C-alpha cells in the first residue's frame, strides 16, 4: 500500500475508534454499522455507559485503587491467600497419589505447582497516571492524550524485562483466570465480593 492509502486507513481507524466520544451523528453511524449491523446489538449503549467505559479503559487502575479502598479490606485478601494455600496443598496431595504418572512427570508437575503465581485483589504497585493530562470539556482531546500516554508507557517498556507484577485486568473487573503462559491465577477484588464469593 502506498503512503496515501495508509494515511487514509489510519484516519478512518481513528474516527471509527473515537466515534463513541464524538457528536451524536458519529455515534449513530458507528452504532448502525459496528454494533447493530456487525454485532447484532439491538440498541446503542447509553451515553453515561460509554463514558464509564472510556474512563475505565484509560484510567482503570486509578478507579481500581478507589474500588479497593471502599470494598476490599485487607482481611479479604488474607482469607483468599489461605484458601489458595489449601487448594495447593490438596492438589499436591492428589498429585502424589496419582499412579498413572511417571516419577519424571510428577516432578515436573510438582515444580509447576510450586512455581504457581498468585494475584489476589489488586496490584501491589499502582500505575502512575501523573503524566496523563486531562482537560475538562475536551473529551476528544483527552482521548488523544490518553492514547499517547498509553503509547509512551508501552514504548518505555521496550527492551526491558517483563513486569511479572503487572495485571491484565483491573480490580473492579468481575472475573478470575488462569494464565498458562505465566503459570499464574488471578482473582480481581470484584470477583471476591458477594454474590460471587
Describe every region a protein language model picked out.
Residues 69-81, 94-99, 173-174, 195:
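Second-shell loop/turn segments in exported
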Residues 97, 119-128:
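Amphipathic alpha-helical coiled-coil segments
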Residues 80-95, 109-120:
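Short amphipathic alpha-helical coiled-coil/interface segments
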Residues 124-140:
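Charge-dense polyanion-binding interfaces
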Residues 136-197:
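Active-site-adjacent "gating/activation" loops or surface patches in catalytic cores
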Residues 1-82, 86:
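Noncatalytic, helix-rich "gating/capping" subdomain that lines the substrate-entry/channel surface
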Amino acid at each position: 500500500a502506498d503512503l496515501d492509502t495508509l494515511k487514509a486507513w489510519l484516519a478512518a481507524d481513528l474516527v471509527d475508534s473515537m466515534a463513541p466520544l464524538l457528536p451524536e451523528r458519529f455515534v449513530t453511524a458507528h452504532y448502525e454499522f459496528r454494533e447493530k449491523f456487525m454485532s447484532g446489538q439491538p440498541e446503542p449503549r447509553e451515553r453515561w455507559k460509554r463514558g464509564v467505559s472510556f474512563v475505565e479503559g484509560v484510567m482503570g487502575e486509578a478507579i481500581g485503587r478507589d474500588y479497593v479502598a471502599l470494598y476490599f479490606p485487607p482481611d479479604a485478601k488474607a482469607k483468599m491467600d489461605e484458601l489458595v494455600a489449601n487448594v495447593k496443598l490438596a492438589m499436591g496431595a492428589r498429585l502424589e497419589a496419582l499412579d498413572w504418572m511417571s516419577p519424571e512427570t510428577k516432578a515436573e508437575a510438582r515444580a509447576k505447582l510450586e512455581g504457581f503465581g498468585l494475584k489476589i485483589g489488586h496490584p501491589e504497585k499502582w500505575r502512575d497516571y501523573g503524566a496523563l493530562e486531562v482537560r475538562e470539556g475536551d473529551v476528544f482531546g483527552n482521548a488523544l492524550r490518553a492514547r499517547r500516554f498509553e503509547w509512551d508507557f508501552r514504548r518505555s517498556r521496550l527492551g526491558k524485562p517483563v513486569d511479572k507484577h503487572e495485571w491484565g485486568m483491573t480490580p473492579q473487573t468481575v472475573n478470575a483466570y488462569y494464565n498458562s503462559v505465566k503459570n499464574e491465577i488471578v482473582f480481581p477484588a470484584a470477583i471476591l465480593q458477594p454474590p460471587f464469593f
